[in-house]
């Protein structure tokens, strides 16, 4: 594989979508990408046609039809396996670049730390679903819980976001532990979007340049 795989991760409200859009415009002219390489934007869950159906099951199902915690974990793994095999791996093998809104770290943070599911099981499922494909760089947008809640006031929460503050704090703590274990790049997101964008650009130049 000669392409590069970049992931933006963090809790809801941290600005992943805004910064992903910025990087889609910035990266092709940054000098980091080889001439002729394409930049593909994707997300988890929902980066493939099958994944979009899984996303609806995971995030927008009525309470009485919501998956149980272990079923939820397996659905995320199925989405990821399809995503890697049908989109991420073929793109990297062509020499193109992939930038994704979330990847396997989110599953460990939300299902492992947030829900308290068996982390060894999550690791096993990750190895199966990713087939060894891992990001070249994960950019973790850090945000305190209070700021996440403030930014999302008035927004319609999906099923995971609606779990409550104690759950979300466990997720934040999980992200911090995972970031240290996996040597992610932590970028403070509690500042104006333009400042976050400049910090991301510097980190990409330092790590991939």
Swiss-Prot record:
Family matches, as PROSITE patterns: THYMIDYLATE_KINASE
Recorded coiled-coil stretches: none
EC number assigned by the record: 2.7.4.9
Transmembrane residue ranges: none
Pfam families for the chain: Thymidylate_kin
Catalyzed chemical reaction(s): dTMP + ATP = dTDP + ADP
Keywords assigned by UniProt, alphabetized: ATP-binding, Kinase, Nucleotide biosynthesis, Nucleotide-binding, Transferase
GO molecular function, one term: ATP binding
CDD domains: TMPK
GO biological process, one term: dUDP biosynthetic process
InterPro entries reported in the protein's UniProt record: P-loop_NTPase, Thymidylate_kin-like_dom, Thymidylate_kin_CS, Thymidylate_kinase
Binding site for ATP: 10-17
Gene Ontology CC: cytosol
Described purpose of this protein according to its UniProt entry: Phosphorylation of dTMP to form dTDP in both de novo and salvage pathways of dTTP synthesis.
Family named by the database record: Belongs to the thymidylate kinase family.
Protein name: Thymidylate kinase
Naturally occurring in which organism (per UniProt): Parasynechococcus marenigrum (strain WH8102)
